Curated annotation (Swiss-Prot):
Annotated binding of GTP, by residue: 499-506, 549-553, 603-606
Organism the protein comes from: Salinispora tropica (strain ATCC BAA-916 / DSM 44818 / JCM 13857 / NBRC 105044 / CNB-440)
Biased composition (Basic residues): 371-380
Disordered: annotated segments: 50-407
GO MF terms held by the record: GTP binding; GTPase activity; translation initiation factor activity
Positions with biased composition (Low complexity): 136-162, 213-222
Compartmental location: Cytoplasm
Name of this protein: Translation initiation factor IF-2
Gene name of the record: infB
Region: G4, residue numbers: 603-606
Region of interest called G2, as start-end residue ranges on this chain: 524-528
A Pfam family matched in the record: IF2_N
Length: 999
């Protein structure tokens, strides 16, 4: 294969000096370094054209426009070789035709069908070609050979694939139009044996009749199969094949017209003659393959293979282009010659198939395109749009809007039981929805609602109250069953004392009970719910009243709400000197929500600044209008310390109870009520303060309160005396429970221990399932990001232990309601009732992070304290709730990362700059304000703009002495570490970062 032409070769070819060629290339705008440099083929072609134009010789002919079509059919010429003069003299060239694009010989017929167009003209040119023109054409052919060789394989494959498509949709032959090919020979004369006319390396070309002209033998100068035709005819080499019989001398072969019709889209309307064979007559291949000549043309309907073509300098038998394929079922083409192929050399040019082509082998049709056509963009887009994710049929039933009731934390197995389905099918449905849930795992409410909506069911999550009611119904226990009137007896009223902290609620109860409870309360504030029963003479009768004392501190909101739910009447205590306060309004709202009557006790009227009328005016704004103002609310002025107005208050309570309420309850039957408070006693175990609402509770009864159960071992009143039985509205302390119940849990007595144990176990299981479902939630991207952020936060881990469950609950709620920044978080690992035990210390020490144990009104034993010291666990004790809240809040803020702010120290002006090879530039400065300190942060200002920031004062001296700091008005010398771009007049500003207090 020919390489790129060098400058000296071009100069030798053009007959000029190399420097002339270099100058010409420079004039053309091409950069060439020396005479040995190579030149690309297009540049070489332009160079030759330029020299030809300068010398007056004609350049290679450009393809002229096609001549208009004529009625008479003219043969389509073969390739367009530039005719060279024979040894005997110059030959006449034909009129130039559009040259074929340089490329490899096409191993088959023309890819596309016959295109109607103007016929080719074979008029010979009048001017013979000169020897110089031949040399120019030969050199140009060599230059185009490289590019043509690279495109040869692609062109051949494309032509074969196009031929396969055109075989199907080929139209009836019409007059041959112009097609790229070599220029015709000297004249239109029939081919003769041994003539240089060679078959085109392709199949038959549609034409109306026999072709009359021959083909010049040369395909390019120097037998280049990819070059521009114009080489000189060479004598046939030995072994290249002798003269072939002409089409006229051969007997006619069966043509498509004489054959029975074959099924094809075009229905074979006419004969497709071979090229350049005779009309419809197949032949073994017209024209011998000659050195320098094209391949022999294929035959007709079942024509023979084409002859071998000559190479550029092919030896005997060296084929140029592949021999022309056969006709309708043409034979294979002859071997193609190489660039400098030896005997029989060159690459074999596969014979182009005619209409029908060669037979398909084991690996498909040779040279054909793949059987599966390329899809259009629109078709691929439609297929992509029609794609859908594969769905697996789970077999789960589909609902029609039926309602399914599920408890909190229900599993997929529970759901499957409700709709009579297989739990595995629901697991698969959740998998299709993107949720990984097992059949027995507790699911959140959102997950159950999502699955129900997907299956067509309406899921209703049962509330805790309804859930407990359904649980008791399984044991034939109905808390709301109606009671016959003959079983009802009157019961004492239950009165709850509520109000703001330090307004004298407990002191008022002490005055009523004639006791001193305030002295026993830590900090003088109530932190428990106290239940007492007092007897008051009224209308010559001994009337019993049950009082419930609730805390007034803001942390005990749940306790106040619980007290309002179990009460009949609320006494709202308001201090006459303070007036209405926030917890007063909250207690008022609790009472209204419980729909119970309110009696207002205006306390502390004995103080000098007391103003009872102000209290009445303030409460009027909240809907409590005094009777003296025309309302229906009783206001009583009392003073708890001297005991003023106590009798009037009790009388108002009894009058309200008799006038507004019908207080009756059955005394027979199992006891039912509410656990107001519970705690863990060291000597007596779990102790619960219960208020009986129905029936009678006796010692030895089996009771269940929340998740705790047991048998009543003893009952105590508010004074510590044992009680044999407790009727309605009677508060007692119950001993004998297996665990500490939660404050506010309902209790009931049952016939045997087995029933209460099953109820307690099912309550505990449902609570655990609900807690697990709520803690897990749905795993979404948002929750995942929140968990990742939470892992980066600093957390304060606590273990809460208190004396009663209500206090622990209040402390936990207060801590979670603290307004703390997002950088820190509060985690309560465990909470419980009772003293601090070794288990609490072991739990705290086993945690990966530091855990603090908070003891609220409880202490740790000596052995437990020693273990905590050994394990490094901190224990803190508190007796007042707001003190615990304040210290824990301070600890949370102490975990915050410190924030720093910039504080300016001073400024200095640069008066002189000294160069030093040892330390760099030394700035001679005078301190204008503040002070300069060694190792302080600094920034350099020039004309009011910051030139450099975050610098450090490396050294600081006064005269020759090192200085730690230099104050205002003094001169100094300093260096900025790692920075030397200091100029006279610059300002050095020093600052430091100080920690800012977090709010």
């Amino acid at each position: 294969m020919a390489g790129k032409a060098r400058v000296h070769e071009l100069a030798k070819e053009l007959g000029v000096e190399s420097k002339t060629v270099l100058a010409k290339l420079k004039e053309m705008g091409e950069f060439v370094k020396s005479a040995s440099s190579t030149v690309e083929a297009p540049v070489a072609r332009r160079l030759r054209n330029a020299f030809v134009n300068n010398t007056g010789s004609p350049a290679p002919a450009a393809p002229p426009a096609a001549t208009p079509p004529t009625p008479t059919p003219t043969p389509t010429p073969p390739r367009t070789p530039t005719p060279a003069p024979p040894p005997g003299g110059p030959r006449v060239t034909a009129k130039p035709m559009p040259p074929r694009r340089p490329g490899a010989p096409t191993p088959g017929p023309k890819p596309k069908g016959p295109v109607p167009g103007p016929p080719q003209s074979a008029t010979p040119a009048a001017k013979p070609a000169s020897a110089h023109d031949i040399e120019v054409a030969a050199a140009e052919a060599r230059a185009a050979a490289l590019k043509a060789e690279q495109e040869a394989a692609v062109k051949a494959a494309q032509a074969a694939r196009q031929q396969q498509r055109d075989n199907v949709r080929r139209e009836p032959p019409t007059e041959g139009g112009p097609r790229p090919g070599p220029r015709p020979g000297p004249g239109a004369m029939p081919p003769r044996p041994g003539s240089p006319a060679a078959g085109r390396s392709g199949g038959p070309t549609p034409g109306p009749g026999p072709r009359s002209g021959g083909r010049p033998p040369a395909r390019g100068a120097g037998n280049n199969p990819f070059g521009i035709q114009g080489g000189q005819q060479r004598p046939p080499a030995a072994g290249a094949g002798g003269p072939r019989p002409s089409p006229a001398s051969m007997p006619p072969r069966p043509s498509p017209a004489s054959m029975p019709p074959r099924p094809s889209p075009a229905s074979m309307p006419s004969q497709r003659p071979g090229r350049p064979g005779g009309p419809g007559s197949g032949r073994p291949g017209a024209g011998a393959g000659r050195p320098g000549g094209g391949g022999g043309g294929g035959g007709g309907y079942r024509g023979g293979g084409g002859g071998g073509g000559g190479g550029y300098r092919g030896g005997p038998g060296g084929g140029g282009g592949g021999g022309g394929g056969g006709g309708y079922r043409g034979g294979p083409g002859g071997g193609g010659g190489g660039f400098r192929g030896g005997p029989g050399g060159g690459r074999p040019g596969g014979g182009g198939r005619g209409r029908g082509g060669g037979a398909a082998g084991a690996f498909g049709r040779p040279g054909g395109r793949p059987t599966r056509g390329r899809k259009s963009k629109k078709q691929r887009r439609q297929e992509f749009d029609n794609l859908s994710a594969p769905t697996m049929s789970s077999g789960a039933p589909r609902g029609q809007g039926q309602t399914v009731r599920l408890s909190r934390g229900a599993s997929l197995s529970d759901f499957a039981d409700k709709i009579n389905a297989n739990p595995g099918s629901l697991v698969q449905e959740m998998f299709n929805l993107g949720e990984m849930v097992t059949a027995t795992q507790s699911c959140s409410d959102d997950t159950l609602l999502l699955l129900g909506e997907h299956l067509g069911f309406v899921v209703q999550i049962v509330s805790p109250e309804d859930e407990d009611r359904e649980l008791l119904a399984q044991f034939n226990i109905d808390l709301d069953a109606e009671v016959a009137e003959d079983r009802l007896v009157s019961r004492p009223p239950v009165v709850t004392v509520m109000g703001h902290v330090d307004h004298g609620k407990t002191k008022l109860l002490d005055a009523i009970r004639k006791a001193n409870v305030v002295a026993g309360e830590a900090g003088g504030i109530t932190q428990h719910i106290g239940a007492y029963q007092v007897h008051v003479p009224h209308d010559d009768q001994d009337r019993a009243i049950t009082f419930i004392d609730t805390p007034g501190h803001e942390a005990f909101t749940a306790m106040r709400a619980r007290g309002a739910q179990v009460t009949d009447i609320v006494i709202l205590v308001v201090a006459a000197d303070d007036g209405v306060m926030p917890q007063t309004i909250e207690a008022l709202n609790h009472a209204k929500a419980a729909d119970v009557p309110i009696v207002v006790a205006v306390n502390k009227i004995d103080k000098p600044d007391a103003n009872p009328d102000k209290v009445r005016q303030q409460l009027t704004e909240y809907g409590l209008v005094a009777e003296e103002y025309g309302g229906d609310t009783m206001f009583v002025n009392v003073a708890a310390k001297p005991g003023t107005g106590i009798d009037s208050l009790l009388e108002a309570v009894l009058l309200t109870a008799d006038a507004s309420l019908e207080l009756t309850a059955p005394t027979d039957g199992p006891a039912q009520g509410v656990a107001i408070e519970a705690h863990l006693d060291k000597g007596r175990g779990a102790v619960a303060t219960v208020l009986v609402q129905k029936g009678t509770l006796r010692a030895g009864d089996s009771i269940v309160a929340g998740g705790a159960h047991g048998r009543v071992r003893a009952m105590l009143d508010e004074n510590g005396n044992q009680v044999a039985e407790a009727g309605p509205s009677r508060p007692v302390l119950v001993l004998g429970l297996t665990a500490v119940p939660g404050a506010g849990d309902t209790f009931l007595a049952a016939e045997d221990d087995r029933t209460v144990r099953q109820i307690a176990e099912q309550r505990q299981a449902r609570r655990r399932a609900a807690a697990f479902a709520n803690s897990r939630g749905r795993a979404t991207l948002e929750t995942l990001m929140e968990q990742l952020k939470a892992g980066e936060k600093t957390s304060l881990n606590l273990v809460l232990k208190g004396d009663v469950s209500g206090s622990v609950e209040a402390l936990e709620d207060a801590l979670f309601n603290l307004d703390i920044p997002e950088e820190v978080q509060l985690r309560i690992i465990h909470r419980g009732v009772g003293s601090i035990t070794e288990s609490d210390v072991m739990l705290a020490s086993a945690s990966s992070e530091a855990v603090t144990i908070i003891g609220f009104n409880v202490r740790a034993a000596n052995k437990v304290r020693e273990m905590a010291d050994r394990e490094g666990v901190e224990i803190r004790y508190y007796t007042v709730i707001y003190q615990a809240i304040e210290e824990i809040e301070a600890a949370l803020k102490g975990l915050l990362k410190p924030e720093y702010e910039e504080v300016e120290l001073g400024t200095a002006e640069v008066r002189e700059v000294f160069r030093s090879s040892k330390v760099g530039n030394i700035s001679g400065c005078i301190v204008r304000s503040g002070l300069l300190r060694r190792n302080a942060k600094a920034r350099l200002l020039r004309d009011g703009a910051v030139v450099a920031d975050n610098l450090t004062i490396g050294s600081l001296k006064r005269f020759k002495d090192d200085a730690t700091e230099v104050r205002e008005g003094f001169e100094c010398g300093l260096t900025l570490a790692g920075y030397n771009n200091v100029q006279v007049g610059d300002v050095i500003e020093t600052f430091e970062m100080r920690e800012k207090a977090r709010v």
